[in-house]
Amino acid sequence: MAIRPLQDRVIVKRLEEERKTASGIVIPDTAAEKPDQGEVIAVGPGKKDDNGKSIPLDVKVGDKVLFGKYAGQAVKVNGEEVLVLREDDILGIVEA
């Protein structure tokens, strides 16, 4: 099953965070916070303006993005959890 976002929605796969502290202590899944960074895996066509024309999104597939801790809706696609976010929920693009 594939998912195609509508309007200004973006599908993001969370990036895995390190499960150890700097001193080597392993953090269990139950205590670890969900990461607030992810990779964009799909983008919608954009919001429609008053004339019905789509306004393209600033993010594109492959971008690494930052988002709020409680942003978006988590869904499972092919057994993998992804987030459905509005472009407004994205705080910024991480540049290497």
UniProtKB/Swiss-Prot annotation:
One of its GO terms (molecular function) is unfolded protein binding. Transmembrane segments: none annotated. GO terms for cellular component: cytoplasm. It is found in: Cytoplasm. GO terms for biological process: chaperone cofactor-dependent protein refolding. Gene3D superfamilies: GroES chaperonin. PROSITE patterns: CHAPERONINS_CPN10. Belongs to the GroES chaperonin family. Heptamer of 7 subunits arranged in a ring. Interacts with the chaperonin GroEL. This is Co-chaperonin GroES. It comes from Methylobacillus flagellatus (strain ATCC 51484 / DSM 6875 / VKM B-1610 / KT).
